[in-house]
Amino acid sequence: MECHGDDTLKRSESEGMKEDLYIDYPAFKYSVHNVNGVTCTDCHADIKALNWDKEVPHPSSLAMVNCDICHEAQGEAYLDSVHKKAGGKGITIPCYACHGYHYVKHLEADSVYERENKICLKCHNPNNFHDWLPQKETHFAYVECAVCHAPDSPRYISLRFYDLISNKFLEAKDLLAALDTDYAHFMDKVDKDKNNVISLSELEDMVLLLRQKDIRGTFHGEIVMELVPSVHHINRGGANRACEQCHNPQSPFFEEVFIVLNKDDGTNERLKVERRVLESYYVNHFYAISGTRVRYLDKIGFALLIAGLSVVSGHLLVRIVTAPARRRKKEKKDEFSI
């Protein structure tokens, strides 16, 4: 960083353009590579030694970084992908085209919006290709692209607490502070039956605890991908267009549900939640027609049904009780008529 920490450091290219060689160390410091002890020469492996007698202490032209050295499984999945095959058309899409160079961070903690903006939307405008998809803007907001485009990869429902007062996601550290706990003891605080799964009633108790601290909100649900190597294996024509995969009461897409607590390093803590939580009023930003139900709406519908039956039953009961009186009244009326 002694050289590359200079924000004026640039290199002239053959086309007459300048290539920026500056590395923002504060940003690099928190990158996933630096946090894991990956040094400059681990990636730029053709730098064997530095010669400080020269103005440029290493070869001025370096080989392309080979990410497969560490990310072998991801590289194999990528080999048979539409992005790799684009190379046959003269388009090169290396790893850093999506993931960036020196400031790579964990994506687990990112929302669908953040994941798409950092990667897919760099090149793709989804509005150009999804006219067949009903409610496409809703899908774009709550379903990660790879959920459909890498259908063989695992996915899960991510629930994050959204503060309705500040209109933003409540940071995990603030949520934990409000509950007087930490990452290690969160389940001890919330999971009353100690089965390592947060039930619907336990989630609602947690929301009530937050309300006592004047924190009012809802859980924001999204379908996101497990970041496994197979998410790189995306091919043209391989997307899942079967709506019933999600919009189905027995959909496997809703089996894995987690409350997600984000960490400063971009990773997260995932806490298993029972599927019935998706029926809660407090997850009212996540609803898939025929796939999930809102329990309070069911209760309202049931109450309306009972009210309707009560009116009919009450009317029938009144008719039965007053039948003798109505019969006598009719007989008197008939006598008067004679």
Q: What is the meaning of each model-derived region?
A:
Residues 1-338:
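C-type cytochrome heme-c attachment and multiheme electron-transfer modules
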